[in-house]
Amino acid sequence: MSEKLTGRVTVPTDVDMIQETKEIAERWGADALRDCDGTDMPDELKKMPAKIYSTYYTTRKDNAWANANPDEVQQVYLMTEFYTAMSQGELRIPLMKHLYKDQLKPNTIHDIKRWWEVVDRTTGEPLVLDAWEYDENNQEVIILNPDHFHDYTVSFLAFIIWDPVHMYNFITNDWQDVEHQITYDVRQPKTQKYVIEKLKRWMKENPDSDVVRFTTFFHQFTLVFNEFAKEKFVDWFGYSASVSPYILEQFEKEVGYKFRPEYIIDQGYHNNTNRVPSKEFRDFQEFQQREVAKLMKVLVDICHDNDKEAMMFLGDHWIGTEPFGEYFKHVGLDAVVGSVGNGTTLRLISDIPGVKYTEGRFLPYFFPDVFHEGGDPIKEAKVNWVTARRAILRKPVDRIGYGGYLKLALDFPEFIQYIEEVCDEFRLLYDNMGGQSPYSHFKVGVLNSWGKIRSWGTHMVAHAIDYKQTYSYAGVLEALSGMPFDVEFISFEDVIKNPVILNECGVVINVGDAYTGPSGGAYWTNEKVSSAVKAFVAQGGGFIGVGEPSACEHQGRYFTLANVLGVNKEIGFSMSTDKYNWDEHSHFITEDSNESINFGEGMKNIYALDGAQILRKDGQDVQMAVNQFGDGRSVYISGIPYSFENSRMLYRAIFWAAGMEQEMKKWYSSNYNVEVNYYPATKKYCIVNNTYEPQETMIYDGLGREYSMKLKANDILWFTFLED
């Protein structure tokens, strides 16, 4: 019997959990200990033969400094509701209506006429400065002479007087008598100097800490609460809380044009990932990345000068770090740790370049919202592990861990036992993968407005949470996260600069609703984009469109690539033209699908052009179709919510679109609940059951040889590939 593997696991602890931590570390084979928000590392455990992670907050947990420097408290751009001028005379607009006053406070320290903006939303034009005043006592902007029945909003800066992450933890754990932590802005001069010196002192005061776990750096993702302390606005990628007059003045000097609040407010959409980014926002994002990276490096260098590793938490105050951007790799971070909600968020961590190792913090977090009487943490743990495992087998994190209050988890012994099994399984698969890339058939490109910088992040609003408008599209990335393809995220700007970039791919996918960032909107009216995609397909490439791909009403078509896809959408303009292609056909793509396929929200009013083949329709709404264009092929699918069956359907669609059907049955399972991955570096391959029930399947190895296999629930079996 081989010796049991240990290490690659981090466990949380607290001052009253010393012996319990030692026992759990022994059972789980942990080699690292961590503290969390609301817990402390016991001195006794600092002497254990394990890495000690110390959570470090650069932006909070120092209210004395924040209160002494109110001008350098973190700020956020907010926009009021729309208000209509219903009568002649002045219009008063309340700033804080539907906002939580314990979290936010309007910034009147800096010149409001310079940094606030009143916009006529009927015309889209900002009001001249003498057209409005501010009533500070009532926190209302007064528009002196508004146009009758025009709509108006106010964009304003507000101080974040209660850190939103601390607020969330405070509410979730029902903390009592805990001071609200204020968020201060490390980018500003006084605070920057203070934080740098404070970190240097901390290094000397904490010689036993091995890893500084920055949580995180400087700017919180956009998270705003309403008057009932409920979430009002969230964007995990949002930049709206990365602003201050100091930062914006620097930005103006760099770009050479005057800043407008509208560049951040974006009509109230705040440049979320579903928006096609404006030039001004791209400029701001680029500026923030570079400046954040510069300051990150200062703090990271301090860690290294004191023989400590620097680790970044992927979340909270992470805005501007952009791990897939151009500047992150120059910071010198040793590691990134992030929360794992599914396969997509796993790849969001494990694919990060420029660090020595990555770590996934798995769910559930040891908080009372799950660990309570009647709670079922083991169920959440199983779903989390099995869902993420598909992605781990393609691109693993180097470590796994858990967070929260260990004492809560100890009340669930079956949970403790299951996590022990997870840790053992993770170490074995990591060892068998050999630290090298698994076998991939070819490259799949995902084409959208954001490209590489939002790798694995499109269709995400709040972290790993499905929305009605996104789940039918997020399923594409979730499926891809565990498939044997190299996946590259390509932006329309990349294509404009280098049209042949698509030729590196076997298949290109465009997925999303019309006019959104993922689909592309007006980018499809750019002849360089449309011509490049058409050339790619005509010369033998494959194109898969999901939802409303290439949608932008232009020159008589709603789908710019209608002739490539073989479908278009009827929006009422072409109803006078009859449509006669309505017959369904059997096809290679749907051979493993049930008669009824789950397209999620689906799509209305899609019709097939002459020559296209319909694979599924709902009445006279085409849900799936295929088409030939030149030497290449295209597939249209209305939506792909994640499921094992849909993942197989997409898998077959990719091979068909690439014209490589004959290659599909290499490292392949006939049962779509079971998947196969091969690792050339170690000559090992695994067969994994993604379900909670036993499965039977036919397995095809790399030479196309087939054999039958039975697997237990959640099973993962490892074999050595013999080529003779």
From Swiss-Prot:
Positions of the catalytic residues: 316 (proton donor)
The organism's place on the tree of life at top rank: Bacteria
Recorded GO MF terms: 1,3-beta-galactosyl-N-acetylhexosamine phosphorylase activity; 1,4-alpha-oligoglucan phosphorylase activity
EC code(s) of this entry: 2.4.1.211
Any one GO BP annotation for this protein: carbohydrate metabolic process
Enzyme category, top tier: transferase
Catalytic activity: beta-D-galactosyl-(1->3)-N-acetyl-D-glucosamine + phosphate = alpha-D-galactose 1-phosphate + N-acetyl-D-glucosamine
Keywords, sorted A to Z: Carbohydrate metabolism, Glycosyltransferase, Transferase
Pfam families in the cross-refs: Lact_bio_phlase, LBP_C, LBP_M
Family statement: Belongs to the glycoside hydrolase 112 family.
Protein function: Reversibly phosphorolyzes beta-D-galactopyranosyl-(1->3)-N-acetyl-D-glucosamine to form alpha-D-galactopyranose 1-phosphate and acetyl-D-glucosamine. Active towards galacto-N-biose and lacto-N-biose. Does not phosphorolyze galacto-N-tetraose or lacto-N-tetraose. In the reverse reaction has activity toward N-acetyl-D-glucosamine and N-acetyl-D-galactosamine, but not L-rhamnose, D-glucose or D-galactose.
Protein name: 1,3-beta-galactosyl-N-acetylhexosamine phosphorylase Cphy3030
